[in-house]
UniProtKB/Swiss-Prot annotation:
Name of the featured protein: VIP peptides
Domain of life per record: Eukaryota
Modified residues (Phosphoserine): 76
Disulfide bridge positions per record: none
Location of Isoleucine amide modifications: 107
Keyword Signal applies: yes
Subcellular locations according to the entry: Secreted
PROSITE patterns on file: GLUCAGON
Gene Ontology cellular component annotations, sorted alphabetically: extracellular space; neuron projection
Modified residues (Asparagine amide): 152
GO terms, biological process: adenylate cyclase-activating G protein-coupled receptor signaling pathway; epinephrine secretion; mRNA stabilization; positive regulation of protein catabolic process; prolactin secretion; regulation of protein localization
Family, as annotated: Belongs to the glucagon family.
Xref: PANTHER family: GLUCAGON-FAMILY NEUROPEPTIDE (PTHR11213), VIP PEPTIDES (PTHR11213:SF5)
């Protein structure tokens, strides 16, 4: 029975230590985020005279720093943090704006406002293809007509040759 109780005891001690450390880390009356540097809760033994002596100590320290003119920090930590947060958010905003402008320029190039402006290159291409196909068809028809005239016995003296050259030149 002792062999079974040792693991149970170990689990119980581990659980107890975790719960005990949690209660020490977090007060029972508030959330962990409630305790910040500015929102400190005084100890039960702290009273008004202790606060006055603490303020006097900080005043002495500030006077000593003012006399030496060598503060540890030129800019307070909060100001530097706020500047860093602003800079980071501002650069992220500029990146988003430039990406948005680039995307709008791509969309603007693809989709235009007027239909005739958008169909210009497509219409010119289709016109060129049609002209090319039509010219090829006319040349084939002229060759076919010329071959039929030769096979039927008509000669160039009858006036077929100039028409054939005109058909080929078109």
């Amino acid at each position: 029975m002792e062999t079974r109780s040792k693991p149970q005891l170990l689990v119980f001690l581990t659980l107890f230590s975790v719960l005990f450390s949690q209660t020490l880390a977090w007060p029972l009356f508030g959330a962990p985020s409630a305790l910040r540097m500015g929102d400190r809760i005084p100890f039960e033994g702290a009273n008004e005279p202790d606060q006055v002596s603490l303020k006097a100590d900080t005043d002495i320290l500030q006077d000593a720093l003012a006399e030496n003119d060598t503060p540890y920090y030129d800019v307070s930590r909060n100001v530097r943090h706020a500047d860093g947060v602003f800079t980071s958010d501002y650069s992220r905003l500029l990146g988003q704006l430039s990406a948005k402008k680039y995307l709008e320029s791509l969309i603007g190039k693809r989709v235009s406002n007027s239909i005739s402006e958008d169909q210009g290159p497509i219409k010119r291409h289709s016109d060129a293809v049609f002209t090319d196909n039509y010219t090829r068809l006319r040349k084939q028809m002229a060759v076919k007509k010329y071959l039929n005239s030769i096979l039927n016995g008509k000669r160039s003296s009858e006036g077929e040759s100039p028409d054939f050259l005109e058909e080929l030149e078109k």
